[in-house]
Regions:
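Short small/polar-residue motifs
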Residues: 14, 67-78, 134-141
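Terminal beta-strand-rich extracellular "head" domains
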Residues: 90-148
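Short, structured beta-strand segments at or near domain termini in extracellular proteins/domains
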Residues: 173-187
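Generic beta-strand structural signal
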Residues: 19, 28, 79, 144-146
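Surface-exposed ligand/attachment interfaces on beta-rich extracellular proteins
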Residues: 37-45, 53-79, 89-114, 161-173
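Substrate-binding and catalytic surfaces of secreted/luminal carbohydrate-active proteins
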Residues: 84
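Intrinsic low-complexity, repeat-rich intrinsically disordered segments enriched
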Residues: 1-62, 87, 94-96
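Structured beta-strand segments within beta-sheet-rich domains
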Residues: 132-173
Length: 187
């Protein structure tokens, strides 16, 4: 199927465009699909869609190591525009004197929102084998680091939110971290 501009000033069709077989492809990069608008405005253009996997790593904020099992360290992601959704079932293979924050990798760096923009993250995490903290309310909370491709864990007690560290959670072999996170990127 070929679509061509008819006439020197023709810019559109008078009816819907239906593609019954094949894909809609652009001849050059940096093009997008404009939704819900009659003009080509950046705010209404989807120019980035990607699905894929990344190798999740777990590092220690202060010292030591924590290694994930190679059979349980692949995360899946979908990126639509600036919104990223990730999920993974990560399991610990081994640890060696881990200390400090638990830092999990992400496939893309997160945005650093301006004061008038909510660019944060939202996520859930279920763990097996880890130690709940004194007065902990609910599960661990994945907290995406702005301007970086990683997240740390926090927990809440009755009055505040606190960091989860290797030291106070007591991680070991076969501990499991299942997470789903949504966050924004700069582009």
């Amino acid at each position: 199927m070929a679509i061509s501009k008819i006439g020197s000033n023709a810019t559109g069709f008078g009816s819907d465009l239906t593609i019954t077989d094949g894909d809609l492809l652009f001849a050059t990069a940096a093009k997008g699909v404009v939704l819900g608008a009659t003009s080509n405005t950046d705010a209404n253009t989807i120019e980035d869609y990607e699905e894929g996997t990344w190798t999740v790593t777990l590092t220690c904020g202060t010292s030591g190591t924590a290694t994930l099992k190679s059979s349980n360290n692949t995360g899946q992601y979908t990126k639509i525009g600036r919104i990223v959704h990730v999920n993974c079932d990560a399991r610990i293979d081994s640890v060696s004197s881990p200390s400090g924050s638990m830092v999990f990798s992400l496939p893309f760096a997160a945005s650093n929102p301006a004061s008038d923009e909510h660019g944060g993250s939202m996520g859930t995490m279920i763990t097996h084998g880890t130690t709940k903290q004194t007065n902990q309310v609910g599960n661990f909370i994945p907290t995406v680091t702005m301007n970086a491709a990683n997240f740390t864990l926090q927990y809440e007690n009755a009055t505040t939110r606190l960091a989860v560290t290797h030291d106070n959670v007591g991680i070991g072999a076969n501990d499991e971290f299942v997470f789903n996170i949504w966050y924004t990127t700069p582009t």
